[in-house]
Every structure is written in C-alpha cells, then in structure tokens.
C-alpha cells in the first residue's frame, strides 16, 4: 500500500476557488495546513458526498511522517477545531452569510479512517471549478516548512499567470495571519526571510 499511495501523491493536485485564499488559516501549524490541503485534495469534485479517507493515505498525502497514531489523531482533531473557528463569509451590501467548509468530520480509530463531508452551501469552492481558481501540486506545498511560506505559496499560485502579485501591507498581514505586534523588522526576519528561503 505504501508504494501505491506515494505514487498517487506525486501527481496529486489541490484545486479550489480563489475566494478561499481570502480565508487566513489562523493559528494552523505547518502540519495542520498540510492535512487541511490533503483533505481538500480528496474532496475535490466529490460534490457533497461523504468521503472516507484511510489514515495511511492521508498521512502520505500530507507528508505526515515519524509520528505516533495518537499524535496523528490529535492533529486531526486540532485541524477540525481550527476549521470550526474559520468561517467563510459571503457579503452583499450590509447583508452577509457565514459558513464552515466541512459539516461532517468523523475520526474512527478502529477502522483507521477519517470520514468527512463538505458543506452543501460551499460545494462550489472545491467542485465544478472552471474559472478563478488556485491550483498547485500537493507535494510542493507539503515540502515547505514555514506556515508563512505555505500561505504565500498558495497566494502566489493564484497569480502565477499574471506574473506579479501586489498587496497592501494590511492585507498581507491579514492573509498570512501575521501578529499585529510584529513591526516591519519582525516581518522581514520572521516572515519574509523564511518565505524567500523556501520559495
């Protein structure tokens, strides 16, 4: 099984609507970001049906190695807890709607599976994508170490066809979840240096 999963991973892509790049992955660790995008990979073009993902496959998709099952299960729980704190917002004038991306999330240690389903109101984020989307190889993302690098990577992938990406500093702070206490010297040292080194 190990070889089959690794072969699958080499060409696995993540595709989603660009609007998901507006949702900062607040407080996610590097490992949790990898798991999240591994889930997005498995849920793409699955409409709203419930998807069962074997632990072993998700571990390989998210480049998750050298950890105990107990730690893996805890990380799966942390991912969903953090996802619940993230909301997807649609605005129209002063009116708005808020949603969470995944409505079902069951970790079954006995069968070694994660069972997950997408919110029907957000199925367009991962399904029937024809325009205004971000696409990247999952393997490229999971080999980055810094959370800032991972988040910048997905933003840059959105703009790969234009050849440039321009952003105001306040938006940059928001999208990369940079602490408000960081001055420009901190941003250069703790955010930009890892990004430049890894990308």
Language model: regions and residue ranges:
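Charged, alpha-helix-forming regions
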Residues: 1-198
């Amino acid at each position: 099984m190990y070889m089959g999963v690794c072969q699958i991973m080499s060409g696995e892509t993540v595709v989603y609507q660009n609007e998901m790049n507006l949702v900062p992955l607040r407080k996610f660790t590097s490992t949790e970001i990898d798991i999240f995008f591994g889930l997005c990979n498995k849920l793409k073009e699955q409409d709203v049906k419930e998807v069962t993902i074997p632990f072993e496959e998700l571990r390989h998709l998210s480049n998750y190695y050298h950890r105990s099952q107990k730690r893996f299960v805890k990380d799966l729980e942390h991912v969903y807890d953090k996802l619940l704190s993230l909301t997807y917002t649609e605005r129209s004038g002063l009116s708005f709607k808020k949603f969470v991306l995944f409505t079902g999330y069951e970790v079954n240690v006995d069968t070694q599976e994660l069972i997950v389903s997408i919110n029907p109101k957000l199925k367009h984020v991962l399904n029937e994508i024809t325009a205004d989307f971000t696409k990247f190889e999952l393997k490229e993302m999971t080999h980055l170490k810094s959370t800032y690098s991972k988040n910048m990577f997905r933003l840059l992938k959105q703009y790969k066809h234009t050849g440039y990406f321009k952003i105001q500093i306040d938006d940059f702070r928001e999208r990369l979840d940079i602490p408000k206490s960081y001055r420009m010297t901190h941003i250069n040292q703790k955010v930009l240096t890892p990004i430049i080194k890894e990308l």
